[in-house]
């Protein structure tokens, strides 16, 4: 079902409302490829060595070994008051959740692991202040999802990491 929704909904977006119900409109695809056999077999082969976990991300530290690498791609913080969408699940990923993620990054750092995090470049200094002891890099990224088509395109986002 996930593959069908991913291939047929607007820009492959997955999102639910506060009741936990899927709420993405249909995409405008004439002949979407729902299932490509070669890709499925290749993915299956790669996933043979992968353990997929369900639960709170903070529990992943229990599976880290040696110098593990963590990549975090949370719901991005809104760029301004009018771009307030950041809820892909029924639980909001607000500033408190962003700070909780930063605390977990500190835990990852303290355990001797590496991390990289991507997020929006809000221009209000929120992430610059929150992650001041880490490396913060601004990079150009293309965005294709926005309610206002004129606001789609390139903008800067942040890459935050604990290594050079």
PLM segments and residue spans:
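Conserved Class I SAM-dependent methyltransferase catalytic core
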Residues: 97-142
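SAM-dependent nucleic-acid methyltransferase catalytic core
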Residues: 1-71, 75-85, 100, 111
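Conserved phosphate-coordination/catalytic loops
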Residues: 34, 51, 92-99, 151-154
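Short glycine-/acidic-enriched loop or helix-start segments at secondary-structure transitions
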Residues: 81-82, 126-127, 148
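A generic structural signal for short, non-catalytic loop/turn and secondary-structure boundary residues
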Residues: 45, 129-132, 153
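Class I S-adenosyl-L-methionine
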Residues: 134-164
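Short glycine-enriched, charge-decorated loop/helix-capping segments at active-site entrances
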Residues: 85-92
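A residue-level signal for conserved active-site and pocket-lining positions in enzyme catalytic cores
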Residues: 3, 115, 160
């Amino acid at each position: 079902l996930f593959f069908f929704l991913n291939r047929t909904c607007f820009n492959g977006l997955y999102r639910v409302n506060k009741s936990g119900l899927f709420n993405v409109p249909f995409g405008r695809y004439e002949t979407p490829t729902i299932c490509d056999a070669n890709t499925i077999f290749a993915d299956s082969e790669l996933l043979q060595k992968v353990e997929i976990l369900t639960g709170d991300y903070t529990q992943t530290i229990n599976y880290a070994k040696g110098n593990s690498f963590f990549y975090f791609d949370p719901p991005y913080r809104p760029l301004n008051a009018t771009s307030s969408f950041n809820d892909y699940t029924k639980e909001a990923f607000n500033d408190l959740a962003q700070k909780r993620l930063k605390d977990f990054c500190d835990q990852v750092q303290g355990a001797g692991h590496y991390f990289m995090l991507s997020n929006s470049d809000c221009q209000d200094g929120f992430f610059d202040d929150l992650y001041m002891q880490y490396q913060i890099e601004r990079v150009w990224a293309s965005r294709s999802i926005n309610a206002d088509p004129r606001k789609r395109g390139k903008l800067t986002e942040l890459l935050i990491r604990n290594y050079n």
